[in-house]
C-alpha cells in the first residue's frame, strides 16, 4: 500500500487564504471534495496527497512528531516549539507571506535603554533595587531564553502570556515583553518600542519538511512533483520572456546582453535566422529592448511566464539532502 503524502495547511484566516493562493500560483489547486467545513482535502491535480487543515501551532507540533510530511507554518512557531529544530525539520522554502518579527520591546519611558547591553544593566539594577528579577511577558519562552542568554542577560524571569502580551507592562504584570509584530503599531499604541538590536527573529510562513515522517518512495515522488511545481513558479516569477529576430543577433551580442542586463538564454541561440528567446529580470526589460533595437531589432516582444521547469529541482534536492543526513 502506497503511503500518501500529508501536507498540513493552516485551517483558517489569512494564512489559509495565502497558502491556498500560493499553491494555486504553482498550479496546485487545494480542494475540499466533502465540503468547506471538512478538515481534510486534496490537491486536484495530484493523487496520493492528503491535505490536513490544522492551526499553525498544531502544524509545527505535527511536523515534529512526523504525522505530516510537509507543512505550512511560521518559522517563529518552528523555532519556539521544536527542540533542535534544524535536526528534526527542514525549512524548504519561504512563501512570502505571514511576515512578522519576534522582538524585545520596552516601555518608551526607558529613554536610556536602547540595546540589549543597556537592558542587562537595567536588569541588574532592577534586581538590586527591588530585590526581585525584572519580569518579561511572552509566549516565546524558548526564543526569549536563547536570545537573552546570547546577550548575557540573566537577571529576569519569564511571565508566560496567553493573551494580549503588549498590555502586560501597562497593567503591571511585567516590566517588558517579547512578542511578535508586523508593523509595530500595536506596540507603539501600548507605549512600547523595540530595542535597536532587539529583533530576535524575522519570521514568515515556510514550507517545512519533517524528518520523522514516513518517507516512502511514493511520498518522495509526490513531494518531488509538488516541489517541482513550486520551483518552476518561483523561477518564472524572476523573469519575463523576451523574443526577437534580426540579422545582427549573434553570440557576442547575447554575451553583452547577459553581462549588462542579467539575461539568460534558456534555449541557446541565436538561430541561423537570428531568432532568440531571452529571459530577463522585470526591472531591466526596457533597457534590454532598447539595446536590442539599437543593434537592429525591429520588433521585441515581451511576455509573462507562468512556469519555467528546469532539469534541476533545487527544492527537492534540499529535501533529499536533509533526509539523507
UniProtKB/Swiss-Prot annotation:
Feedback inhibited by histidine. The keyword Magnesium applies. It catalyses: 1-(5-phospho-beta-D-ribosyl)-ATP + diphosphate = 5-phospho-alpha-D-ribose 1-diphosphate + ATP. Its main location: cytoplasm. Keywords: Amino-acid biosynthesis, ATP-binding, Cytoplasm, Glycosyltransferase, Histidine biosynthesis, Magnesium, Metal-binding, Nucleotide-binding, Transferase. One of its GO terms (cellular component) is cytoplasm. Disulfide bonds: none annotated. GO terms for biological process: L-histidine biosynthetic process. The keyword Transferase applies. It holds the Pfam family HisG. Its cofactor is Mg(2+). It is an enzyme of class 2 (transferase). Pathway: Amino-acid biosynthesis; L-histidine biosynthesis; L-histidine from 5-phospho-alpha-D-ribose 1-diphosphate: step 1/9. It is found in: Cytoplasm. GO terms for molecular function: ATP binding; ATP phosphoribosyltransferase activity; magnesium ion binding. Belongs to the ATP phosphoribosyltransferase family. Long subfamily. This is ATP phosphoribosyltransferase. It comes from Nitrobacter winogradskyi (strain ATCC 25391 / DSM 10237 / CIP 104748 / NCIMB 11846 / Nb-255).
Amino acid at each position: 500500500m502506497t503511503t500518501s503524502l500529508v501536507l498540513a495547511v493552516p485551517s483558517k484566516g489569512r494564512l489559509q487564504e495565502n497558502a491556498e493562493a500560493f499553491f494555486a500560483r504553482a498550479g496546485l489547486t487545494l480542494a475540499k471534495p466533502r465540503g468547506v467545513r471538512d478538515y481534510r482535502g486534496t490537491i486536484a491535480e495530484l493523487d496520493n496527497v492528503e491535505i490536513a487543515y490544522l492551526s499553525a501551532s498544531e502544524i509545527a507540533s505535527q511536523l515534529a512528531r512526523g504525522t505530516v510530511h510537509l507543512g505550512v507554518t511560521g518559522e517563529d512557531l518552528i523555532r519556539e516549539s521544536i527542540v533542535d529544530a534544524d535536526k528534526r525539520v527542514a525549512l524548504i522554502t519561504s512563501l512570502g507571506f505571514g511576515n512578522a518579527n519576534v522582538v524585545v520591546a520596552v516601555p518608551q519611558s526607558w529613554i536610556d535603554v536602547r540595546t540589549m547591553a543597556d537592558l542587562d544593566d537595567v536588569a541588574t539594577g532592577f534586581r538590586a533595587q527591588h530585590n526581585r528579577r525584572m519580569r518579561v511577558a511572552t509566549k516565546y519562552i524558548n526564543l526569549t531564553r536563547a536570545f537573552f542568554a546570547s546577550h548575557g542577560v540573566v537577571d529576569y524571569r519569564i511571565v508566560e502570556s496567553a493573551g494580549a502580551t503588549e498590555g502586560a507592562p501597562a497593567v503591571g504584570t511585567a516590566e517588558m515583553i517579547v512578542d511578535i509584530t508586523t508593523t509595530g503599531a500595536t506596540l507603539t499604541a501600548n507605549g512600547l518600542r523595540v530595542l535597536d538590536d532587539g529583533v530576535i527573529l524575522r519570521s514568515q510562513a515556510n514550507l517545512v519538511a519533517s524528518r520523522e515522517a514516513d518517507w516512502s518512495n511514493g511520498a518522495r515522488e509526490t513531494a518531488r512533483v509538488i516541489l517541482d511545481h513550486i520551483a518552476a513558479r518561483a523561477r518564472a516569477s524572476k523573469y519575463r520572456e523576451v523574443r526577437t529576430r534580426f540579422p545582427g543577433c549573434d553570440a557576442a551580442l547575447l554575451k553583452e546582453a547577459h553581462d549588462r542586463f542579467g539575461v539568460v538564454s534558456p534555449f541557446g541561440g541565436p538561430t541561423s535566422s537570428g531568432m532568440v528567446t531571452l529571459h530577463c529580470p522585470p526591472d531591466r526589460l526596457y533597457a534590454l529592448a532598447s539595446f536590442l533595437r539599437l543593434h537592429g531589432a525591429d520588433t521585441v516582444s515581451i511576455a509573462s511566464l507562468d512556469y519555467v521547469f528546469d532539469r534541476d529541482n533545487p527544492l527537492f534536492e534540499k529535501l533529499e539532502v536533509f533526509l539523507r543526513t
